[in-house]
């Protein structure tokens, strides 16, 4: 098998590898060292998926050499290396290091040039997805960037800082990963109020959707009500784009004010600073009520009453789909037809935060000239 020395890969324990042993999550090792995630390859394997699943979570060195089972060409090894290599199996000594790390992850250096993956540097090509969840070295990050110390409550650091706007905007969009759950914002009894699980959004808002649509269906032509519902969903996609581009990313219009920085941080900056924090990803209901109220009043002021009920139900349903989609783009293995959208959104975080504002689609990005394509430039990094 060819040797790849140009990647910085992650280290995994044997126990971790053994846990990835199903058709939906299949890892194998080669030469008891290289780890491959072959889940996507199962359906494409010429010899069928059963021959691979028999070795899920195990080493495939001997079976790869066994021509009686299946002949493997050099290109088969190259495909494994280029497309499915995700990390290395820890030795006993390395495993001991893993067990002393609360996040059970240690990044190992495998490249010949001595470079390491740095999430705070925007990149042309996204790294392996597993890398996005490697914990930031808090101490080194603070020493290098002189920005926020992940060991201490973040909001008070911003309020007490002497950051200039350009420095704050530059640094807040450079991704970090806390690695121990959610980083502290307040560090006191208010902390639980800053966290929202993904399931809260449908539980809180789908009943409201059902109520408003139910009122519309009872009081107007049902086919027309469904049409207005669909219009509401479509209008939401434009609102989604507009809010993300002009409210969440009001970076250029930020005043030189710590209160403004703190507001920006709570509204959206925190998500860019810690994009893989699963409890700071969907919108807290309280914040959504504040943002939604003007739109609710506008819809009911402009449209006949029951038209407004149907249209608002569609818009609210569109929001629920958006927030759930946003969560799963960050935290799930998605079917093939969703992978381009996932890549597109992650590039908004790790490549260029000034493009790619659509989350559920890139339609409005194409309309308004903010499409984040393969040739798009990296966001500038002014402060190192």
Curated annotation (Swiss-Prot):
SUPFAM superfamilies tied to this protein: Cytochrome b5-like heme/steroid binding domain (SSF55856)
Family matches, as SMART domains: Cyt-b5
Binding, Zn(2+) 1: 244, 249, 268, 272, 348
Reaction catalysed by this enzyme: an N-(1,2 saturated acyl)-(4R)-hydroxysphinganine + 2 Fe(II)-[cytochrome b5] + O2 + 2 H(+) = an N-(2R-hydroxyacyl)-4R-hydroxysphinganine + 2 Fe(III)-[cytochrome b5] + H2O; an N-(1,2-saturated acyl)sphinganine + 2 Fe(II)-[cytochrome b5] + O2 + 2 H(+) = an N-[(2'R)-hydroxyacyl]sphinganine + 2 Fe(III)-[cytochrome b5] + H2O; N-hexacosanoyl-(4R)-hydroxysphinganine + 2 Fe(II)-[cytochrome b5] + O2 + 2 H(+) = N-(2-hydroxyhexacosanyl)-(4R)-hydroxysphinganine + 2 Fe(III)-[cytochrome b5] + H2O
An MF annotation (GO) of this entry: 4-hydroxysphinganine ceramide fatty acyl 2-hydroxylase activity
Localization terms from the record: Endoplasmic reticulum membrane
Alphabetized Pfam families for the sequence: Cyt-b5, FA_hydroxylase
Pathway: Sphingolipid metabolism
Domain of life: Eukaryota
Lumenal side: 217-221, 303-304
GO CC annotations, alphabetized: endoplasmic reticulum; endoplasmic reticulum membrane; membrane
Keywords (A to Z) from UniProt: Electron transport, Endoplasmic reticulum, Fatty acid biosynthesis, Fatty acid metabolism, Heme, Iron, Lipid biosynthesis, Lipid metabolism, Membrane, Metal-binding, Oxidoreductase, Transmembrane, Transmembrane helix, Transport, Zinc
Cytochrome b5 heme-binding domain sequence ranges: 9-90
Free-text disruption phenotype from the record: Causes a lack of alpha-hydroxylated very long chain fatty acids in yeast sphingolipids. This confers resistance to syringomycin E, an antifungal cyclic lipodepsinonapeptide produced by Pseudomonas syringae.
Listed GO biological process terms: ceramide biosynthetic process; fatty acid biosynthetic process; fatty acid metabolic process; inositol phosphoceramide metabolic process; very long-chain fatty acid metabolic process
Note: Present with 3290 molecules/cell in log phase SD medium.
Protein family according to the UniProt entry: Belongs to the sterol desaturase family. SCS7 subfamily.
Designated name of the protein: Ceramide very long chain fatty acid hydroxylase SCS7
């Amino acid at each position: 098998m060819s040797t790849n020395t140009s990647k910085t890969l992650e280290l995994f324990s044997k126990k971790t590898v053994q846990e990835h042993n199903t058709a939906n999550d299949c890892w194998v090792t080669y030469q008891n060292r290289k780890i491959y995630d072959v889940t996507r390859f199962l359906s494409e394997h010429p010899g069928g998926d059963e021959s691979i699943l028999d070795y899920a979570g195990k080493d495939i060195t001997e079976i790869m050499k066994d021509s009686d089972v299946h002949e493997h060409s050099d290109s088969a090894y190259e495909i494994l290396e280029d497309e499915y290599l995700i990390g290395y199996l820890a030795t006993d000594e390395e495993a001991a290091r893993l067990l002393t790390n609360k996040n059970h992850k240690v990044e190992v250096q495998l490249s010949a040039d001595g470079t390491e993956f740095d999430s705070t540097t925007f990149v042309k090509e996204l790294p392996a997805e597993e890398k996005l969840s490697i914990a930031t070295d808090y101490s080194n990050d603070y020493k290098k960037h002189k920005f926020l110390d992940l060991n201490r409550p973040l909001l008070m650091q911003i309020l007490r800082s002497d950051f200039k706007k350009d420095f704050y905007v530059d640094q807040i969009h450079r991704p970090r990963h806390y690695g121990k759950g959610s980083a502290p914002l307040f560090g006191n009894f208010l902390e639980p109020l800053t966290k929202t699980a993904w399931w809260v959004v449908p539980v809180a808002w789908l009943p409201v959707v059902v109520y408003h649509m139910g009122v519309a269906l009872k009081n107007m032509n049902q086919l027309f009500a469904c049409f207005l519902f669909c219009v509401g969903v479509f209008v939401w996609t434009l609102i989604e784009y507009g809010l993300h581009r002009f409210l969440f990313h009001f970076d250029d219009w930020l005043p030189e004010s710590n209160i403004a920085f703190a507001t920006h941080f709570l509204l959206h900056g925190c998500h860019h600073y810690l994009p893989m924090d699963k409890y700071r990803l969907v919108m807290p209901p309280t914040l959504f009520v504040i943002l939604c109220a003007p739109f609710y009043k506008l819809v009911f002021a402009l449209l006949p009453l029951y038209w407004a009920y149907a249209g608002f139900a569609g818009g609210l349903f569109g929001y629920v789909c958006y927030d759930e989609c946003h969560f799963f783009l960050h935290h799930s293995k998605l079917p093939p037809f969703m992978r381009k959208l996932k890549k597109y959104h992650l590039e908004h975080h790790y490549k260029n935060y000034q493009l790619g504002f659509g989350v559920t689609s890139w339609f409005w990005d194409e309309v308004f000239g903010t499409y984040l394509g393969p040739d798009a430039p990296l966001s500038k990094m002014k402060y190192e």
